[in-house]
Amino acid sequence: MRVSVLRRFGNLPTTPLYTGLIKTMLRRFPSILTMLCLLLSFLPAASVHAATPTPAIDPLTSAQKMLAKMTPEERVGQLFLVTFTGSTADQNSQVYSLIHDYHVGGVVLQTANDNFVSSPDTISSAYQLISQLQNIEYQASQSQPASSGTAAPNGTGTPASTETVEVLPTAVPANYIPLFVGISQPGDGSPDDQIFNGLTPLPDLMALGATWDPALSEKVGAVAGQELSGLGFNLYFGPSLDVLETPESTLGNGLGASAFGGDPYWVGAMGSAYITGLHTGSNDHLTVIASHFPGRGSADRPAGGEPATVRKSLESLKQIELAPYFSVTGDATTPAGTADGLLVSHIRYQGFQGNIRSITPPVSFDSQALSQILALPAFASWRTAGGMMVSDDLGSPTVRRFYDPAGTSFLARLVARDAFLAGNDLLFMGNIISSDSNDNYATVVNTLGFFNQKYHDDKAFAQRVDESVLRILTAKYRTYGDFNIQTAVPSVDGLDSLGQSTAVTFEVARQSATLVSPNMADLDTLLPSAPVFRDQIVFLTDTRTERQCSTCNESPMLAVDALQNVILRLYGSQVGGQVSSGHLVSYTFTSLKAILAGGPGDPSLEGTLRQANWVVINMLDAEPGEDQTKTLHSFLSERQDLLRDKNIVVFAFNAPYFLDPTDISKLTAYYCLYSKSAPFVEVAARLLFKELSPQGDLPVSVQGVGYDLFTATRPDPGQVIGLSQQLPEAPVSTISATPEATATPKVGDTFSVRTSTILDHNGHPVPDGTVVHFTVSLKGADGVVQQMYAVTSQGVAAISFSIPRAGLLEVAAESDPALTSVILQLNVSGGGFSVTIVAPTTVPEFTPTATFMSTPLVTPSAPLAQGYPGLGGWFGMVLLLVVLGGVVYWLGSRFMSVRWAVRWMLCTVAGGLLAYTYLAVRLPGASDYLKLGGFSGMIGVVLLGAALGLGAALLWQRLVTGSTKRSG
């Protein structure tokens, strides 16, 4: 074997010396290899990763390169999101032409346009349609060599020619850019979702808000992101970041349970978590467009009619409406929690637009107002980083009513132009139909032609187009990294995993279920037990229908017997026999009309209700104008004879604020489930039979039960705020033979204190920004009281201060109305230090917890009583002035005369006394100064007064001396 190895070294000398050397190396090769491996193991870890793959190209750089290659028509097309009718996109379809010939940037799929088919083919058909749409764009880009944009003098690629351009379909695009394929799927099925079957039935946003758990919100977002991106969607409209500060069903903002809640901080926290889930669940293949910017939670009317108005000041808008949008843009804590774009709503805002008139445009068409909003720091930094603005549906009735109130002339191209120049980058055309066009397709084509013409004629307009297209391309590169059909169209194998995450929805249903009325203590009295076998139960259900498409069969949003069937499945004769199927009967709200005033009567229904022990009412939303809602109100007010001596339980499968106080007073129990999918119906059944307890808390104010969210989210006055030393974050660990010792605080060091998590009335962390007042006291002969303020972050506030001298230091905290905290005592002495936690006297069960060494000290009386000079402060002032007076007298007698020495001393002491008197009698400004400066501040004021007195004496001497010289 060794000979064969040696023969491989054909050019080596064959002398015995070389032969022996090679034999020796071969013999010792295992030892040499072992030594090399051992040496390599000591190399730094960084060297192992030195040959990592080349990092991905920056999306902005890729977008700039693509923009330079695009024709004007391709650029203009990227601005438009279009809709179309039907569930296919063959070569004869209008959407095929819009993609192939006019290069539109994206499409939006909607149930109203029959883009989806009925179950069981809903998912497979949607996947095929999206794949078909992306392939139209891809095949068109491959049919010709790549084009290069005609460079303009400004270098943007804008053609220099300004000649009139004939509007015709252009040659197929030579640059492949994946389409945006968008959808709005906020949860809870119809009417807001677009896909009703085949996907996991996700909850409404308010159900997430009622859990007060951002982690659950992120999980739901991840499910939505994974399933929608698996179908091929890459543009998501949502989540809604509207703040329902004072929800009023009488006005109706149209949001129902499609908002997280009414607290700006929590809406932002839940929204940020949801966006994080969308990004991570889709592997960053979803471009997330948060809605409905700048917020329509306080709108005076629902969308769909004339433009709504939000009458709030600018400051109020920044604190309430805009706060959640700050948290997902410039103030976002993570890239995953940052929205890629904002959907600009067609609403007017007094805080940005001044007095609102009928001619005041919605903010989506008001360049001055929108620019003012986007100039706010959080939005400005986000826009600089590539954030997109997307117009809401330009074909909505709201837009048409504003532009054409008389119904005579509606020019879509001008609407699109105004929205674009107002600051929107991406224009959602919707089903817009211009008065000079036959249909939506012709309207979009004419609008594209109008934009192309302006691009050629107007350099400023062309530059504005290029800016928006660069944002759009950057967003698409962030989504895909590289433009190829393999990444734009997901694998069909992923469809098998869709709709398998119902466990997440059930967990949300379990944690969000809320007892609205009465409270838990009263519930056990009013409803001590669950239904039993002999009880008769009548279910009254608000049944409405939905269609996946115009030719699809109708199906109920909430089946009339949905709750009855779940109860039989869980508690019927097959599983313990807690109830009898013969004792359960279900009716619709419509059936109640027969037994109301003016109805024909229904003896059978009346008889069933009279015999019932339980009446369980399942209601959906109750916006004004809903006939079902009127029926329920009439039933509760007119037929109390049928409800007397019965257990009346209401389950609200939407928002909780639709019943008034009078209606609620007639109920035994009122629960809110927020969503109507199967997991929520099951939780309702388990609540009725007391198998589960409601764990959720109302995320909005409910006037019907006197629940005010602002009060509920303030600190709970019954809690004791904990305090602890806040240690600096440990540095990144490195291999070390001996750990470093913990630093010991000493005089002059900075000491940090943090609170425990401060809880609100519902037991959740208080919103960020809650003010906490700290009192820092240094005990001693010249003790100090210092007032410090901090705001919470995730329920915790912290302060840092310098240790002025050795002694006993105490720290307390309060956050109105929570006024009690433990006392943190820091004892610093020459021999060491100790930190002791002392429980407040009002909470005897707490015991002091000491760390390190603890030496009890006698605490002298404070020199400042409640922030003002006390006896200790007076003695300190007198001592100081005696010393100062003595020094001044000695200097005067040595350098001047005894007479002037006495005058200097008296003026110095008088100045100090006057300054002390100013503080002691609490003249204007004294209180605030002492609270900030404490005892040292008082000494400073006395010294200043003494200095002014001495200065007056010197001036007096100079005047007298000068007068004597002149007389002489």
Label for each model-derived stretch:
Residues 33-44:
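Bacterial N-terminal signal peptides
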Residues 42-54:
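Sec-dependent signal peptide cleavage junction
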Residues 51-103, 196, 384, 403-772, ...:
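Preference for extracellular/luminal or secreted protein segments
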Residues 51-197, 201, 518, 612, ...:
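N-terminal hydrophobic targeting/anchoring segments and the immediately downstream early-domain regions
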Residues 71, 91, 119-128, 132, ...:
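Second-shell residues forming the walls of enzyme active-site clefts
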Residues 77-84, 105-109, 179-187, 235-239, ...:
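Hydrophobic faces of well-ordered beta-strands that scaffold small-molecule active sites
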Residues 98-123, 328-363, 610-625, 917-924:
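Short acidic, glycine-rich surface-loop motifs adjacent to enzyme active sites
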Residues 117-189, 209-232, 236, 265, ...:
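Active-site-adjacent structural elements in enzyme catalytic domains
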